[in-house]
Amino acid sequence: MAQLQAVKGTRDIFPDEIARWHYVEGVIRSVAELYGFSEVRTPVFEYTELFQRGIGATTDIVGKEMFTFQPDPNGRSLTLRPEMTAGVMRACLQKNLLSQSPVSKLYYISDLFRKERPQAGRQRQFTQFGAELLGVSNPAAVAEVLTFMMQVFSSLGLHGLRLRINSLGDLDDRARYREALRDYFMPYQNDLDEPSKERLEKNPLRILDSKNPALQEMIAGAPRLYASLKPESVADFEKVLSYLDDRQIAYDVDHLLVRGLDYYCHAAFEVTSSELGAQDAIGGGGRYDGLARELGASNDLPAVGFAVGMERLMIAMEKQGLFATLNPHGPLVYVVVQQKELTDHAMQVAFRLRKSGLKTEIDLAGRSMKAQMRDANRMGAAYALFIGQSEMESGHYALKNLETSEQTSLDLDAIIEVLHEAVSQESARP
């Protein structure tokens, strides 16, 4: 019988790599707390209609990339979430969250699912962190989430990033721009690839998302959305840029940036990394005031958010050597059992140490002392506590500092005190 393997486009994450994930997640949570964002968690699957209405029927995500299923032949279609914003908005509307507070600031670290061709930093099951700020219509909200995102990157030590930003205007602005794009691309209709021909009819803005090298020169000559913006939209965008200038956040205005989701309006942005090659996007976001109405609300709801791909983020960090100094802490103390028959007593000692809050490891396999010491060194234990027959009878145990080789014999209460003092001294180091 053939050995089962992980599903294509998924991957297992083992303890040595988990330490990196915990570190990055810890930084995200710390920065989120600084900015007053609280964590939200939503279901892994939603009704398919949520994403069709929320993301947009003409997007690649809805058209090609969703994992959709129908558990009940007579029931509604369900989809594994391909992104988080639509689900977060659905949850907030369902709970009527903004009736409790006029502003809602939420963040998430969540697994998502898309039918993509697996490659480095792009899996069919992947993780994003992101934030959504609901209830604030002025440009300060865009600056708030952008600053939050960029502070996460700087706190992680990441460099070589490029922030591109554009204004997509409001519905009227985009309607004018779609007609301008249709007029521009129509004479080139025979030169377009099949996906772009379809987009020309349904939503010509999506042509600007094409990665087809043969179309890039044509796309570069397309009209700029900025020329279709009304004065109010221009003023809104310029205020966002002034906030970024005030915070000394470098950016490039890219008038061809439209992002891949239909719900964006006004400011939209994307961050790329020089470490990621052709697929260089590490995250992005923007305003999406009309999403609430698309999901059944009676009015638009001011909203802005971003999402960052964790796998891509960590690839960029790895290439910049930002994990090199990350040293996952092993156990503080390793309980070494000198005779197999003393294992029960050693487990009681380990229980006391753990109950007092000390990170403790113990051999349960009855291996030799040499093997146990080798294991303690491999794990990076700071101390070894030896349990033999005489130690058990006297209640005094040998405690060895594995860095200095200094060894002393103490009762268990004194050992616990010594170890807590060692933890305190380590925590006090700069």
Swiss-Prot record:
CDD domains: HisRS-like_core (cd00773), HisRS_anticodon (cd00859)
Organism superkingdom: Bacteria
Coiled-coil positions: none
Claim: Ligase is one of the keywords in the record: yes
Entry-linked SUPFAM superfamilies: Class II aaRS ABD-related, Class II aaRS and biotin synthetases
EC number: 6.1.1.21
Subcellular location: Cytoplasm
Catalyzed chemical reaction(s): tRNA(His) + L-histidine + ATP = L-histidyl-tRNA(His) + AMP + diphosphate + H(+)
Keywords, sorted A to Z: Aminoacyl-tRNA synthetase, ATP-binding, Cytoplasm, Ligase, Nucleotide-binding, Protein biosynthesis
Ligase keyword on record: yes
GO molecular function: ATP binding; histidine-tRNA ligase activity
Enzyme class name: ligase
GO biological process: histidyl-tRNA aminoacylation
Gene Ontology cellular component annotations, sorted alphabetically: cytoplasm
HAMAP family cross-referenced by the UniProt entry: His_tRNA_synth
Summary of subunit composition and partner proteins: Homodimer.
Family to which this protein belongs: Belongs to the class-II aminoacyl-tRNA synthetase family.
Name assigned to this protein: Histidine--tRNA ligase
